[in-house]
Amino acid sequence: MSVDEAPSTAVPDRELPAAVRRIGQVSWVREPLDDAVRNGGRGRRTVIAAPAVATLGTPADGEKFALLPEAREPGTVFMMGDNPDLPRFPLRPSLGDFFRLRFGGGSAAHLLQSAKLALEHGLDEKVIMACLLHDIAIAGLISSHHGHWGAQMIAPYVDEEVAWAVEKHEALRYFADESVGYSYPEAYIAYFGPDYEPPEYIRREAEDARKHRWYMTSRLVTINDIYSFDPAATVEFGEFEDIVGRNFRQPADGLGFDDSPVAHMWRTMIWPNNFL
């Protein structure tokens, strides 16, 4: 029996092998192997095209539009909706669901270890929450200006001080404050080079943050940040369920579906591969 003739009930969905290969520089196609079984033998090539933010300044710039002819191939579509290679979300997603279902092992471990360190230091729950969420944008959305993106994502659901701390840690991390025990991270010397100088707008933002009444909340995020996290350490999101319950306003309809001004950001993490 050929793959095209295989019955749709032959293999449970989550046990299907991933038939994914790269096309172009940073784009991917799911070949019919999986979908032929899943869709009752109809078969469908599904193209995943990288967004502009992932390709600008690289040889793959413009690749998304170069892939448009792929849709003319019989049985070929661009990815929209659930990607079978990603875990599906429940009807009303919670913050914990994003940690478990979207944030990669390294990103989730980084956030959880930072929050654990703040917890072990006996810090205020607002600081612990800010540590838990400080790189949430990197974990599931975007790296550039991640403090600002992250602060916007969580603003409707946390205390204003927590969102402010997440936003300002992005600038403060570049500038030492030895009076409170924060030195410039050695990891940054390796990441960016010993001659890296933050742009002037970042310097101004850090200077303004140091004058703010919530400065130490954000500074404590940088102090408890794990710049080189321990891959052997195990910290579970469940350790923070009570703190999250007291400090994160979970929307009744679920993150991404509460009609908030930032719901689209959470939906983007649910369906990160949508063509549009």
Outline where the language-model segments fall.
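Metal-dependent phosphohydrolase cores
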Residues: 2-43, 49-276
